[in-house]
Amino acid sequence: MTNEELLQIIEKAAREKATHLSLNNNQLSSLPPEICQLSNLTWLSLYNNQLSSLPPEICQLSNLISLRLDHNQLSSLPLEISQLSNLITLDLNNNRLSNLPPEISQLSNLRSLSLFNNQLSSLPPEISQLSNLTELYLNHNQLSSLPPEFSQLSNLRSLSLNHNQLSSLPPEFSQFSNLTWLCLNHNQLSNLPPEISQFSNLITLHLSDNQLSSLPPEISQLSTLTWLSLNHNQFISLPPEICQLSNLTELSLNHNQLSSLPPEICQLSNLVELDLSNNQLSSLPPEFSQLSNLSWLDLSNNQLSSLLPEFSQLSNLTELYLNNNPQLSSPPPEIVEQGTEAILTYLRARLEAKG
């Protein structure tokens, strides 16, 4: 789109007192100062252009509620951004931002802030003043720590910090008591603070691709948790605390070093999906057959030699993966190749013969 065409669009939108304007996918490298004429705009989308900066005049659009600037080449934000005090949603993901101006703290009505895929190595303490923020996406940046003030964002419901360089979480992190979704995949975490127990509303917790070998006992207090992913860590045994998370429906522990499972695993009676692939499991406890709601189970790439006949009592199991267990003799390879139903039929027959 040429600058002349853009000016015509702006002039027409101003004349019509437009409230919504989409300028996505137009290879725009700049915006003219005339953008400030669109005083009635509440929604502006500039997705997927080539903007490297914003004119200060854009900050005169004081009625804006939603502003999309994702997939551009922005390396900084104008200080005047603080004037967009009615903004509720601000999308800046997939840019080149290396820092945020402290003035961003004045966007007091902001509910959703998306900053993933930038080059942020730190956050301004002032970010803590965004007290209405419920969604914050900071994944795929270069954050190695969080400011203590960060924990004052007490209304956060969803927080994404995956693909950063975090090696620890501050104890203050526990003040996010309203969090329901937390993603910390692909960091450098070797432990979690006991204060994690105070995430009393947490439903989903992603901790894959870290350096965890244990969990704090306090994690057992996350009674609302339904989804827990711990893939690609350093667990050699299943932390017993996990077995007290009775509302878990999905648990993923692939690519660890588990050699056995505790009998207490049967307490996870609501489990629907369980991924234990790529571990070193040589057997499963008899109590495993009590996971009556299990429908999807991946045990591939382990060291299993046999499955107990009682395994056939998993009446809801529809998908079972046993490939690449080189020592598995019961069920034999030719049965395993036929799939889940054949495996369960084989084990059922063995159970009947046993009984």
Language-model region placement:
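Hydrophobic secondary-structure block in the mid-to-C-terminal portion of proteins
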Residues: S300-N301, N323
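The feature captures the LRR N-terminal capping module
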Residues: M1-Y47, S52, P56-H71, S75-N94, ...
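Acidic, glycine-rich calcium-binding repeat modules characteristic of RTX/beta-roll
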Residues: L307
